[in-house]
C-alpha cells in the first residue's frame, strides 16, 4: 500500500512539474494574434516606433530578387546579452512581417525573457 501511495505522489509531482510549460505555451499561442496585431499596428504609425514590453524594437522587411519578402524583428537593448532575431519569409510583405514577430516572440519566450502575465498586462495597457 505504501509503494502505491509513493507511486501516486511521484506521478502527481511529475505532472505538476511538466504541465505548466505546456500551459504557458498554450497561453502564448492564444495571445500571439493580439501581440502580432499590436506590433503590426505600431509599424503602421508614422514616427511611432515599435515598443514591446517596454523595449524599443526594430522590424524591417526587404524584397528579395526571387519575389519573396524577408523580415526581421529584434530588440537590441533587451536581448544584447543573447541576441534574438525573429525572421519571416513570404511572398506577401505583411505575412513576412507577422512571421518575424511570431518567431521573435516565441524565441524570447523560450529564453524566458518575459512571463505570460507581463504579456497580458502589455496587451491590456495597449
From Swiss-Prot:
Keyword Ion transport: no
Known tissue expression: Strongly expressed in gills, hemocytes and reproductive tract, with weaker expression in muscle, heart and digestive tract. Not detected in eyes and hepatopancreas (at protein level).
GO biological process: defense response to Gram-negative bacterium; defense response to Gram-positive bacterium
InterPro entries: Anti-LPS_factor/Scygonadin (IPR024509), Anti-LPS_factor/Scygonadin_sf (IPR038539)
Gene Ontology CC, one term: extracellular region
Subcellular location: Secreted
Keywords in alphabetical order: Antibiotic, Antimicrobial, Secreted, Signal
Annotated signal peptide: 1-24
Function, as annotated: Has antibacterial activity against the Gram-positive bacteria E.coli (MIC<50 ug/ml) and P.aeruginosa (MIC<25 ug/ml), and the Gram-negative bacteria S.aureus (MIC<100 ug/ml) and S.pyogenes (MIC<50 ug/ml).
Protein name: Antimicrobial protein 1
Organism annotation: Scylla serrata (Mud crab)
Amino acid at each position: 500500500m505504501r509503494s502505491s501511495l509513493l507511486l501516486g505522489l511521484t506521478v502527481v509531482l511529475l505532472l505538476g512539474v511538466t504541465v505548466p510549460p505546456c500551459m504557458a505555451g498554450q497561453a502564448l499561442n492564444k495571445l500571439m494574434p493580439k501581440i502580432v496585431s499590436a506590433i503590426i499596428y505600431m509599424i503602421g504609425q508614422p514616427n511611432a516606433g515599435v515598443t514591446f514590453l517596454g523595449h524599443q524594437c526594430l522590424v524591417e522587411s526587404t524584397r528579395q530578387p526571387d519575389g519573396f519578402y524577408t523580415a526581421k524583428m529584434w530588440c537590441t537593448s533587451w536581448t544584447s546579452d543573447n541576441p534574438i532575431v525573429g525572421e519571416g519569409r513570404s511572398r506577401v510583405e505583411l505575412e513576412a512581417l507577422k512571421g518575424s514577430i511570431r518567431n521573435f516572440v516565441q524565441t524570447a519566450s523560450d529564453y524566458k525573457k518575459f512571463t505570460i502575465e507581463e504579456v497580458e498586462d502589455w496587451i491590456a495597457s495597449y
